[in-house]
């Protein structure tokens, strides 16, 4: 087999791998394993006797040296300690530029499971003495029936949800709700609606995760059949997911002048770039928008074209990865109005690297993505056109409520038929509750996943 044939075979295999599992930072079958978990002391002792760490760490180095985007920042192979555990070893190879690569258990060791969520998602806060959580949205029908709603302040104790209010002396309980099952599944489309605003039909969809595109198909079909004029896409609680699903949604939304054009182009390290060039004549890879079939194709290939001229996207500082890729990929072809908070800032992607012999699989950053104009997402995130905070002090009306602050801005702009970019929506349209000052968020919200 010639060098060119071998290169072509490798590119085909890489593309097969990427088409099935490439996501913006994770694989959805892993939902509870810590990326920092290491072997027990007994397992470490046994592994060192068998030389498992040395062998696996050398495998880790070889894979990273081939696929890692910042491979030139890795330490020299002769300077590495191959006797350390694989997770620690993997971390020792990462570039200072890298905030996203991680390792996790290989599915050959832990098996697979459906991606699940709890009955509600929340953000924790503290003033240094009092800790509480604010409900962001509720997915459990049982908890909704029991009265739990967005904006509630809660504390969790022994599978009980304590509802309360903040007083001068801290959190004061007012009611108790028995907890729901911690493993209730939910569709990734949290809510979809159509509003009649003046003479326009305005679609709204709150989308939680770029997972199975089947969750989107019926909603997009409904929007297509109703011939919506505008779309408000709520991605403020969406940390990312599959690139294929991101393309599917973007392709449905985009105006017809984007059909056949570049959805995404990706750059790689020097080794992968050379292999792609030898196989295809280009160091980059390209992914294109296709022409929608509007339900007339084979089952499973349905793509409904909404052919919109603009889209309103609601964001938070935790709108990341695939959420950002959707925004940046649409910008060359239509008006994208971003409302909320500046996004997370992840313009890179990865694929999983595994070997069934070893306990851990790798999820290193392997590429940088760009839109058709070679624009990408910087580490600062995507700036907003209308700033509205989504933190503790902002009124938490139900998602989809036309008076909910971020949605209200979008609907008001549609009514006005005039956009003033770079505005500060807080000064005129956003309601704030009177709350105690001095509370700070604890960590990331519960819906966050490392994609």
Predicted regions located by residue number:
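N-terminal secretory signal peptides that target proteins for export/translocation
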Residues: 1-15
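Residue-level recognition of alpha-helix boundary/capping or hinge positions
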Residues: 3, 111, 120, 177, ...
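Sec-dependent signal peptide hydrophobic core
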Residues: 17-25
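Residue-level signal for secondary-structure boundary elements
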Residues: 25, 68, 72, 418-422
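Small side chains
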Residues: 25-26, 203
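C-terminal motif of bacterial Sec signal peptides marking the signal peptidase cleavage site
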Residues: 29-32
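Flexible, low-complexity junctional segments that flank or bridge functional domains
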Residues: 34-232, 237-239, 245, 252-255, ...
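C-terminal "post-core" interaction segments
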Residues: 217-218, 223, 228-230, 239-451
